Curated annotation (Swiss-Prot):
This is FMRFamide-like neuropeptide APGQDFMRF-amide. Disulfide bonds: none annotated. It is found in: Secreted. The keyword Secreted applies. The keyword Secreted applies. Belongs to the FARP (FMRFamide related peptide) family. Coiled coil: none annotated. Keywords: Amidation, Neuropeptide, Secreted. It comes from Delia radicum (Cabbage root fly). FMRFamides and FMRFamide-like peptides are neuropeptides. GO terms for biological process: neuropeptide signaling pathway. GO terms for cellular component: extracellular region. The modification Phenylalanine amide is found at residue 9. In larvae, expressed in the CNS and thoracic perisymapthetic organs (tPSO) but not in the ring gland or abdominal perisymapthetic organs (aPSO) (at protein level). In adults, expressed in brain and thoracic-abdominal ganglion but not in corpora cardiaca and corpora allata (at protein level).
Amino acid sequence: APGQDFMRF
């Protein structure tokens, strides 16, 4: 989802 790159774990 756009803007959720910090949730890639």
